[in-house]
Amino acid sequence: MTEDFYIFSCSYQKKVVPLRCNFKQINDMAPIKRTLQALITERMQPQKVMLLFGARRVGKTILMRQIVDSFKGKTLVLNGEDIDTHTLLGKASVSNYRHLFEGVELLAIDEAQHIPQIGSKLKLIVDELPGIRVIATGSSSFNLQSEAGEPLVGRSSQFLLTPFSQQELSAGETPIETYRKLEERLIYGSYPNVTLFDTYAQKREYLQDIVYAYLLKDILAVDGIKNSQKMYDLLRLIAYQTGSEVSYEELGKQLSMSRNTVERYLDLLQKVFVIYRLGGFSR
């Protein structure tokens, strides 16, 4: 049995070099409007939860804050990594949530996957607080999607934020600029911060930093994932086969791993948005 996989990644070297960026250049840049902003805003209705997924560093927090800033009404922004947020939401009762969110029309929770039982808590909030809207972001689908899935059936919409699309980038450049940057973007991708660096070396270093500091962090924290080197080796192998059919058995033989372990690792990589699976077409 074979499957197609598409991977976005960088060179898997272990050396990570601190980066220096021209912050004046960043501050002077006009913000690139994300196409999802209008879609999320349109669907953001009372008693509904907008779930925004995406890999780390693709701009979920910025997009969430842009949506909050443009909202005409009372808003509240919480950080799911803040222990105070856990304390506030810990007592899952109608009286507590009515007290906390009285008058709030838009509740935004960043990195919501860190909050225990987030799905049932969001369900209670939208069911019992008339007029409230919720937007929650998550850097992996391990907790947020699994916990929020069943409790929020019929109450939520899910969105996947990717690095900048060419459509988004083209809005601020001429066709000639787009043509000149095409090869660079095909090689280094379009993570928001990558587009700010001037040299290829800086882009490579930043991508390496993302891989080791962010993208694989969630995977290696999962119980049972002990051999990080095997994970890196698997990523190298499928990176060489981007857009081609891959065999679980063949990958397992090359890595001295069982087929089940290969499938499990690939499933985990997909859940943190390191790879995208493209199913084959059968006649």
Protein language model regions, located:
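Conserved lysine of the Walker
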Residues: K60
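Hydrophobic anchor at the beta1->P-loop junction of P-loop NTPases
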Residues: L52
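Hydrophobic positions on the alpha1 helix immediately C-terminal to the Walker A/P-loop
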Residues: L63, I67
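N-terminal pre-Walker A segment at the start of P-loop NTPase domains
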Residues: F8-T41
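Accessory nucleic acid-recognition modules appended to NTPase machines
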Residues: Y200-R283
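Short regulatory helix/loop adjacent to the ATP-binding pocket of P-loop NTPases
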Residues: F142-Q158, E173
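Conserved catalytic/switch belt of AAA+ P-loop NTPases
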Residues: G119-F142, E150-P151
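Short glycine-rich substrate-engagement loop in P-loop NTPases that contacts/grips substrate
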Residues: L76-L106
